[in-house]
Amino acid sequence: MTARRDPKPGAKRLVRAQTLQKQRRAPVGPRAPPPDEEDPRLKCKNCRALGHTVRSTRCPMKCWKAALVPPTLGKKEGKENLKPWKPQVEANPGPLNKDKGEKEERPRQQDPQRKALLHIFSGKPPEKLLPNRKGSTESSVFLRVASRPMPVHTTSKRPCVDPELADRSATEMSGRGSVLASLSPLRKASLRSSSSLGPKERQTGAAADIPQPAVRHQGPEPLLVVKPTHSSREGGCREVPQAASKTHGLLQAVRPQAQDKRPAVTQPGPPAATHSLGLGSNLSFRPGAKRPAQAPIQGCLNFPKKPRLGPFQIPESAIQGGELGALENLQPPPAATELGPSTSPQMGRRTPAQVPGVDRQPPHSRPCLPTAQACTMSHHPAASHDGAQPLRVLFRRLENRRWSSSLLAAPSFHSPEKLGVFLAQSPHVSEKSEGPCVRVPPNVLYEDLQVSSSSEDSDSDLQ
């Protein structure tokens, strides 16, 4: 036990002696305290350091002379710019320096003047100047003149019109003038107040006049009605099943833009009153509807918009088969109370003997049809010798918003009494429907037919 305790105090003494010798040999200056003398639990309040207190002489805040200062690496007297250098201005420059300065100034003054003149006469934008030529640009500011912008030529080119269409429109206008000149003043006034004036074409093998405007207009569309035709003078009728889908081709073939070599007969379309349609005096039209205006027959660049379809449409399968004839465009009447002379062959209910050429006579007054909406068509003057009777188209509305149509052979009546007797004695037409028939006012029938015709016209234009 004693042998183990003895070397410890001796070792401590040796370590202390060695540290004292090192302290004596070390140069005078700050030194770090030995680790055994530092106490980490102490903290100086002045320097916020650990290992000593404020009273300790090792605090750097008390002994500044003992603080560590970085040693200087060398002298820097010649490298620091303590006195800034001033530009040296020569008071008396030599003759060589004067010549060089004049030669440099002359091209600098000529360059901006030349560029300013080029900018005035040529109109080109000036080039970007270098930053070292600021003085020369200031002297040439007075030479710069604001130039006008180049004029913009806006030439409106007129659309090219086909010469054939122009010739056709000229002949049609001349034909209209001759027809108007031959009529009486009363008929002229009625024709001028009509809704449309369109050319009509006489088709070989079909006795029907088909007015067709060149440009479709807004407002109520025309009504499509089937008209019977006769192929011979013996009174024989050609029966062909008719469908609503076939009207597109006929409408496109009859349009005035199509090149047709057959002779064209221009006849005016007079205004149609409510009694001419046979729909009754209670036929009402929309208050916002406008009468269509006649447009010239020329090439149109702006196509009209597709009209909106109403809630009621006549499907193609609802129209029954009948005699295929020419289609007529029946314009809506301009006023319900207008009682003027009607000169339209398709509006009046007449026999072939009552239809002359141009000088037509007003038709007889007709009563309203109570239950069935019927449209009776007259014949063309070419078929006036056959003695055939006109046909009556009967439309009936079903419950599922569908319509059924049928053709009835009706004799010609010259008085309203005979017409009433025939309607009372005529049997009802058998209908191919799925439900019972509902009585509908005439104005609903007219609006539904009008919507269906407008949809068919729009589809044919798109195709």
From Swiss-Prot:
- Biased-composition ranges for Basic and acidic residues? 74-83, 97-114, 159-170
Task: State a single Pfam family of this protein.
Answer: zf-CCHC_6
Skewed-composition ranges (Low complexity): 180-198
Residue ranges of the region described as Disordered = 1-42, 67-115, 150-295, 326-365
Q: Which domain of life is it from?
A: Eukaryota
Q: Give the record's family classification.
A: Belongs to the FAM90 family.
Q: What protein is this chain from?
A: Putative protein FAM90A2P
Q: Gene that codes for this?
A: FAM90A2P
